[in-house]
Amino acid sequence: MFEKKTKIICTIADNRCDEGFIRQLYENGMNVVRINSAHASLEGAQMVVDNVRKVSDRFAILIDTKGPEVRLTQMADAVGFVAHTDEIIEIIDNPAEACRKGRLYTTYPHMAEDVPVGSDILIDDGSVDLSVIGKEEGKLICKVMNEGVIKGHKSVNVPNVHINLPAVTEKDKKFIHWAIKANIDFIAHSFVRSANDLQEIQEILDAENSHLKIISKIENQQGVDNLDDILTYCYGVMVARGDLGVEIPAERIPLVQRDIVKACRARKKPVIIATQMLQSMIENPRPTRAEVTDVANAIFQSADAIMLSGESAYGEYPVEAVKTMTKIAQQTEQTLDVNLDLDLRKVVKPVAVVLARSLVAATQELPVKALVFDTYTGRVGRYISTFRPEVPVYAMCYNDYTMRELSLVFGIKAYPFHKVRDKEEFAAESIKILCNEGKIQKGDLVGFIGGVFGAQVGATYMELKYI
């Protein structure tokens, strides 16, 4: 069976995180576990982490922060109310109050100050559109543009309007400090608007000397506009199509997704496509044809990872959803072409990326069975992956956290590895590991890429040899 290269992220909730369940997901193709802090307590998140590590210490854990989001307060009437077209609804600046019919309150106390007349306020991912037709002190006067049910704690989006919220909330900070102690691998920060939004998180990580990597969730037009700067300060990007599809017109989502993936590829950064990939499988055992095509198109576009949210967190068919993604990936990847395009202006280590490109090019002309590299940082793996080699790629990782970070990179299978004296020992020891697993055998031509064994950091040589 063709081993898939696209990585799969599964959202797991603490009310369904037993060891057996996680093992099933892992054995069917899951590479990364996602915990959504918006719906988790610290105790619940720790339970997920503990059970994940019982299954394996080789795959990564990612935690989402809430970021600068606005929500409705709780509803005075638990069932909410129906907003009818052309009704007038007031949005009042008082986060301590409960919403009721005709009056809404949000978690942000300065809506009236920040939101101008003429704006659209979208409730619950756009289910209800409120047009701002007037404002008074501490109050917005809105007209209901379409009928819908409004319930408490639902999302509030104001497209093309800057809301002056802090980039990192107090709850985010608690989860970040917990993530450092719990040895989490990735922090996916929500609603990243600019590189400045990442700096506060990085300062916390640096103060703790943490290896955690930041994933920027692009969820609004500001994030799209500032993507190039954002990519400088993060490990990778998540295309979070849920809020993004509310903040910008839905018909632009495919184009924005394509452009974000292209930008990440140029910068050699992992990119995740998320939200509603197999949405119907929350309730049905089989996906729609459109969903299958959506997953395949993400892979065609060169996404490193694809993500399940509700499908695995609370859906009726979580294991089937992972199996489905795996099958789509296996089928699609067999048609991918090697892509040797390279722009050296956008890479940190030009020598390493040129070596990686040359080694992948060699697989087009010679019967190379596998590519192998050793790494402290995983950077060479990201470089090799960008060119989409057809042959398997194996990483020998000197740090366990680097091994887990590569769980997010297309086509890389990572192994823990011990320090060696020189490149001959590196080749011999890695061959032994891969032969024992049946990945390669005597007589195979294998490509190696690595660095000098000393102070210089980064790949400095490539080698092809028969084993």
What does each model-found stretch correspond to?
Residues 1-467:
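Non-catalytic helical/linker scaffolds that mediate oligomerization, partner binding
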